[in-house]
Amino acid sequence: MDFRIGQGYDVHQLVEGRPLIIGGVTIPYERGLLGHSDADVLLHAITDALFGAAALGDIGRHFSDTDAAFKGADSRVLLRECVARINAAGFTIQNVDSTVIAQAPKLAPHIDGMRANIAADLGLPLDRVNVKAKTNEKLGYLGRGEGIEAQAAALLVKQGG
């Protein structure tokens, strides 16, 4: 079997006047993430991991932040389009593991919703999708609450490989 592993990363600045959307879940908080789309840092990291595993570049290659078509885009729609593109290239997703690093707000109450959204968008059973939440122990820009970061790993199998 032809296994492929991809790694994804994203970070966005926290600002006032934007909703905070992570893993497709709108989280009550006084600030949200700045970005061209909805700035869903977790879904962007997962999308990058998937494109990377399939050697199809990255999220910016497919959904440019300079393209007006993606202004305010729902990252769940972008993730589903990513899945369609990697499936068309002959890959199937085996699992995704991810980590969100945020000093605040507390993300644990929202993890189940994030996992459910991601599993649905990837067409995977829930037990093949993991989301972890960590703080940065008050260190650096993440620890000061200036932004939120996400990392992801994905395993794909090339069909017929």
Curated annotation (Swiss-Prot):
Molecular function (GO) terms for this protein are: 2-C-methyl-D-erythritol 2,4-cyclodiphosphate synthase activity; metal ion binding
Q: Which InterPro entries match?
A: MECDP_synthase (IPR003526), MECDP_synthase_CS (IPR020555), MECDP_synthase_sf (IPR036571)
Q: What Pfam family is a match, any one?
A: YgbB
Residues that bind a divalent metal cation? D10, H12, H44
Q: How is the cofactor bound?
A: Binds 1 divalent metal cation per subunit.
A Gene Ontology biological process noted in the UniProt record is: isopentenyl diphosphate biosynthetic process, methylerythritol 4-phosphate pathway
> Hey, where's the site called Transition state stabilizer on this chain?
H36, T135
Kindly list the cofactors needed.
Answer: a divalent metal cation
Look at the named UniProt entry and state the broad enzyme category this protein falls under.
Answer: lyase
Q: Which SUPFAM superfamilies match?
A: IpsF-like
Look up the record and name the pathway of this protein.
Isoprenoid biosynthesis; isopentenyl diphosphate biosynthesis via DXP pathway; isopentenyl diphosphate from 1-deoxy-D-xylulose 5-phosphate: step 4/6
Tell me the keywords, alphabetical order: Isoprene biosynthesis, Lyase, Metal-binding
Q: Which reaction does it catalyse?
A: 4-CDP-2-C-methyl-D-erythritol 2-phosphate = 2-C-methyl-D-erythritol 2,4-cyclic diphosphate + CMP
Q: Which PROSITE patterns match?
A: ISPF
Q: Which CDD domains match?
A: MECDP_synthase
Complex formation: Homotrimer.
Q: What does this protein do?
A: Involved in the biosynthesis of isopentenyl diphosphate (IPP) and dimethylallyl diphosphate (DMAPP), two major building blocks of isoprenoid compounds. Catalyzes the conversion of 4-diphosphocytidyl-2-C-methyl-D-erythritol 2-phosphate (CDP-ME2P) to 2-C-methyl-D-erythritol 2,4-cyclodiphosphate (ME-CPP) with a corresponding release of cytidine 5-monophosphate (CMP).
Annotated family: Belongs to the IspF family.
Q: Matching NCBIfam families, A to Z?
A: ispF
Q: Under what name is this protein listed?
A: 2-C-methyl-D-erythritol 2,4-cyclodiphosphate synthase
Q: Which organism does this record belong to?
A: Burkholderia lata (strain ATCC 17760 / DSM 23089 / LMG 22485 / NCIMB 9086 / R18194 / 383)
